[in-house]
């Protein structure tokens, strides 16, 4: 049995654990500290098709990441897992300058040829939008795609770990290279996946690496409403907050994008209040909702906002990914799957050369 360790049980680590657990010749152990994980505090909208980012490699990963959910859902269903973390209920895109909607509509039509998952597309007026999301206002027109989905990140990770039945060790660990293998805690592993998001530098800097990954704080607030919102589309206005409705009257509002806060996990009521006030202009019903709690997580960004994955330069059998930013629930599962493929030396659909780890993880001194 080959021993494989995964450090970090967010969306990337949990997906890798799930796919590796299917291999009978591997013994997989997951280590997770459990503090500040971005996945648990993620708003969770899967709708990359309206992005105007010029980074073609990023868009390809995000597009394939949205498509990959279809495979992941099918695989989990075969494993006998509940698919209660994902719902394709559509997405509403709002723009302050509504003349831009036509251009985005045309872009999405063109992209639908390679991404049929986008589903039905249309520019809706307020009356039509209110048939799908009663009470939404503050716009004349919006763009709708029926294929937009929402994901409960924390629940997805729970389901992946349940299905994988791997050993989960809840502690903060470090990585020590030995002449053969790597020591983590009390054990030695032949291969290691580092899926610690913004904390990647904490593992690699002691080994003489420079890691171009910075933390960004995100906060969101959950509300409870009287009406069931299971079939409501997610709402993406211009700006940093989104409205994400769930079954059972749960509604999430978020998330903030706070730079220069390091790994701070305190709730900032002022920022959450500002977000709520901005959201009230679009959804006044929010004033009647009860706040049911806040979530805070730390996203990982590289200096050029690109994600990366691959083998850590100079550490044979150690693979890492980071820099997923605010699209981690879209790109996380497909990256986790690819890390699992790399461990097994299997075929990849995305070429790591387009997401080169050596641009972001550099050895500056040998131990």
Name every feature range the model reports, one short phrase each.
Residues 15-22, 33, 44, 84-85, ...:
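Active-site substrate-recognition segment that forms the wall
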């Amino acid at each position: 049995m080959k021993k494989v360790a995964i450090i970090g049980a967010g969306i990337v680590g949990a997906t890798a654990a799930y796919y590796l657990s299917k291999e009978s010749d591997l013994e997989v152990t997951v280590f997770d500290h459990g503090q500040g994980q971005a996945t648990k505090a993620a708003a969770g909208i899967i709708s990359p098709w309206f992005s105007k980012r010029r980074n073609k490699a990023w868009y390809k990963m995000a597009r394939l990441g949205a498509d990959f959910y279809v495979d992941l859902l099918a695989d989990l269903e075969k494993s006998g897992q509940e698919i209660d973390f994902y719902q394709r209920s559509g997405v509403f895109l709002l723009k302050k300058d509504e003349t831009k909607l036509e251009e985005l509509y045309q872009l999405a039509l063109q992209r639908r040829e390679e991404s049929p998952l986008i589903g039905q597309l249309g520019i809706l007026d307020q009356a039509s939008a209110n048939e799908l999301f009663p009470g939404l206002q503050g716009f004349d027109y919006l763009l709708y795609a029926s294929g937009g989905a929402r994901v409960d990140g924390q629940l997805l990770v729970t389901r992946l770990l349940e299905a994988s039945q791997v050993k989960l060790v809840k502690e903060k660990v470090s990585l020590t290279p030995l002449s053969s293998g790597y020591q983590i805690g009390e054990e030695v592993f032949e291969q290691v996946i580092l899926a610690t998001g913004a904390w990647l530098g904490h593992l690699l800097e002691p080994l003489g690496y420079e890691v171009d990954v910075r933390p960004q704080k995100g906060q969101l607030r959950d509300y409870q409403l009287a009406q069931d919102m299971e079939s409501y589309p997610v709402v993406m206005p211009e700006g940093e907050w989104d409205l994400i409705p769930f079954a059972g009257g749960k509604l999430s509002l978020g998330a903030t994008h706070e730079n220069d806060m390091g790994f701070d996990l305190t709730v900032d009521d002022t920022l959450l209040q500002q977000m709520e006030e901005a959201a009230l202009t679009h959804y006044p019903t929010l004033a009647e909702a009860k706040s049911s709690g806040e979530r805070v997580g730390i996203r990982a960004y590289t200096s050029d906002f690109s994600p990366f994955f691959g083998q850590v330069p100079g550490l044979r059998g150690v693979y890492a990914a980071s820099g997923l930013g605010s699209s981690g629930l879209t790109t996380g599962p497909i990256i986790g799957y690819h890390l699992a493929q790399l461990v097994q030396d299997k075929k990849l659909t995305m070429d790591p050369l387009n997401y080169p780890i050596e641009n972001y993880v550099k050895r500056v001194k040998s131990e």
